[in-house]
């Protein structure tokens, strides 16, 4: 069973992440993790923090000489701004006199609409939004991307699975239906908004610039594809074992994600059954080999992969920290007020795709290991290859 946890606050000393249940023999390094974290900072419309934020990575356990040992893998992502926050966010008790006059320590009593601020204050009994926003911040996704790098390495090395994401909508701009999905991360990452369609990309950039001029924010939709998944990952036996249910849960757990769909998703609900499903056809060659004539289901049927590319989309709402804050109340007085203004992005949809890749990789790694087992990459690859050879219909 693959499990993971993260700890840490946005302006704390570091984020800490641990994943367990992965086999020995995965080749991965801090350089690989650093490259993925750099991808997370990509995208036109990111805020000032992305310009000076550098992720300092330290591998604490689970690897030796760039190869996993089979135990838990732990990663620390240090906060390079910690010296500015070490008194305000000190984990240990601190003399109140040291906090006097520090602007960063001022209570945040005007919760932002759309953010975790107010509900978190109510739930945990805080009179200040600082403890809520520090953990609720999307900064936490850096830890998940770090762990996703390890899972991605396993998928590539043991099963030949590649995970790719791209932006299909920002604001009112959408990629035209039928646009071929990308197969190369390098091509997508070279685009300013990580969009595979150049014409749509230019319109998205213009949309972001217009929102910036209006002191506003934008959401959008990312699509994640996993190429090379064999049939049979996941299960129809129980709801919580269905692969699409597990993927949807982890994607919805990403900050600001408000919806998930597989394949043609909600469009399928508006079609008749005769044009909603993927017909099955034989392939030429030895053995009984088949394929789907289309991929409307997104590579998942009955909670299991079909062997076609896995295709899942996640919808991200506009960022709730605005330069022109919305109406709220001051919880200290109960009076009407405007929400607190925090440094933020205009649009973080391109980065959301990178985070979504990480979560898809972690879920697929867990599903593959449940199916094929193995305490080492070599063993699980051998089991995987044996499974493919034994399929009655491939």
From Swiss-Prot:
Could you name the domain of life of the organism this protein comes from? Bacteria
GO molecular function list? chorismate synthase activity; FMN binding
According to its UniProt entry, the protein's GO biological process terms are: amino acid biosynthetic process; aromatic amino acid family biosynthetic process; chorismate biosynthetic process
The metabolic or biological pathway listed in the UniProt record of this protein is:
Metabolic intermediate biosynthesis; chorismate biosynthesis; chorismate from D-erythrose 4-phosphate and phosphoenolpyruvate: step 7/7
- What are its E.C. numbers? 4.2.3.5
| Annotated catalysed reactions | 5-O-(1-carboxyvinyl)-3-phosphoshikimate = chorismate + phosphate
Residues the entry annotates as binding NADP(+): 40, 46
Asked whether the keyword Hydrolase is assigned, the reply is no
Q: Does the keyword Isomerase apply?
A: no
Q: Which residues form the signal peptide?
A: none
Enzyme's top EC category: lyase
Which GO cellular component term is one of those annotated? cytosol
| Bound cofactor: record note | Reduced FMN (FMNH(2)).
Cofactor(s) of this protein: FMNH2
* Residues engaged in binding FMN: 135-137, 255-256, 302, 317-321, 343
| Keywords tagged on the record | Amino-acid biosynthesis, Aromatic amino acid biosynthesis, FAD, Flavoprotein, FMN, Lyase, NADP
The record's listing under HAMAP family reads:
Chorismate_synth
Q: What does this protein do?
A: This reaction introduces a second double bond into the aromatic ring system.
The family annotation for this protein states: Belongs to the chorismate synthase family.
User: What is its quaternary makeup?
Assistant: Homotetramer.
Name the record gives this protein: Chorismate synthase
Q: Which gene encodes it?
A: aroC
